[in-house]
């Protein structure tokens, strides 16, 4: 991913209605050294042709059959917050930033992961944050205190949107039929081979 020159970045988000991956044309550059500012985001929806949809289709293979990743609507309003979320940092211009969305049954106050309090709107909310961990922290708070489900996405500078969490539609601590275990061995730890038998082989006892 090419690093963009330092300058003013005027963001204009464009979404493509694909099955798993959308394109957002997010950054355009104007050369002005040692100056950095963000203008109000202008958002417009854009249709994609069938060939673009076919090219994006393989990106959804990770999700189990029957689950369709939710589409990010950039027109979703943000919570009411008078402070700062810490900005998107310089990383957002050359790497990525993160967007978390949720639906609230009413207007209520919540704690921001970056500090301070904000008012979530009744209905859909969208919040841009610089780090994935901030989305996870806020999402945990939403689920534990407010009983609200959430989703978050990664947005790249070239406009691509990647759906991140929950990956298959079910939060990780819940059982989900069809979910494949990672590093799963159907045996107890006591049935692993003796570590001395695999010493100097480059393998671990749980690998056998």
From Swiss-Prot:
Region feature Ferredoxin and ferredoxin-oxidoreductase binding, mapped onto this chain: 141-149
Membrane topology, record value: Peripheral membrane protein
Region (Disordered) residue spans: 49-72
GO molecular function: mRNA binding; protein domain specific binding
Localisation per UniProt entry: Plastid, Chloroplast thylakoid membrane
GO annotations of cellular component type: chloroplast; chloroplast envelope; chloroplast thylakoid; chloroplast thylakoid membrane; cytosol; photosystem I reaction center; plastoglobule; thylakoid
Main subcellular location: plastid
InterPro entries noted in UniProt: PsaD, PsaD_sf
GO-annotated biological processes: acquisition of seed longevity; photosynthesis
Gene3D superfamilies: Photosystem I PsaD, reaction center subunit II (3.30.1470.10)
Residues bearing PTM Phosphothreonine: 48
Maturation and modification: Phosphorylated by a threonine specific thylakoid kinase in a light activated and redox-dependent manner.
Inducing or repressing factors: By light.
Keywords linked to the UniProt accession: Chloroplast, Membrane, Phosphoprotein, Photosynthesis, Photosystem I, Plastid, Thylakoid, Transit peptide
Biased segments, Low complexity type: 50-64
Transit peptide, start-end: 1-45
Assembly behavior: Interacts with PGRL1A and PGRL1B.
Family: Belongs to the PsaD family.
Additional comment: After Mass spectrometry, it is not clear if Ala-45 or Glu-46 is the N-terminus of the mature protein.
Function description: PsaD can form complexes with ferredoxin and ferredoxin-oxidoreductase in photosystem I (PS I) reaction center. PSAD may encode the ferredoxin-docking protein.
Full protein name: Photosystem I reaction center subunit II-1, chloroplastic
Lineage of the organism: Eukaryota, Viridiplantae, Streptophyta, Embryophyta, Tracheophyta
